[in-house]
Amino acid sequence: MKSFLETIRKPEVGRARSRQIRGTLIIMLFGFLLGVVQKRIDGNANIPSFLQSLDIANYFGRLSIWILLGTVLSVYAETPLRAGINTSLFFLSMIAGYYLYCHYVLGFLPKQYMMMWVAISFASFFLAQLCWYAKGRGPIAVLLSGGILGVLFAQTFNITRDFMYIIG
């Protein structure tokens, strides 16, 4: 199985473990800060005017941006295992920042909703390893890339009967 997967994409070796750990810690910090910023924007109607004009709250409120960030983290990792670790820790730290802000600043904690996102974050460990191979070569990499784009398009476009008038 290992030799078959290496025909799709071969893992990079040679990066020091301390650099890998430092990179993972930076990704976790970025995820935590992004979670806090997202909840701050979600929970506050009085945000700065430049953020209102960019409509950032609307973009970060959609699933497609998080799929894109997870895909980028996984595809640019050195190995499939590192892709899974970095992506799942990014999402778990983002959830931690988001719900710690909910609990300590806003005074509520939706536990069932939070547990759903935690389960999705754990699933991202395996999905990130799969996405890592999308940057490889051959028909399987093309199929994985097409699947990723298909999921992103399904999240981005409202494909209904009215959509058919736009595309012809």
Functional labels for PLM-detected ranges:
Residues 52-65, 110-120, 166-167:
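Structural signature of hydrophobic alpha-helical transmembrane segments
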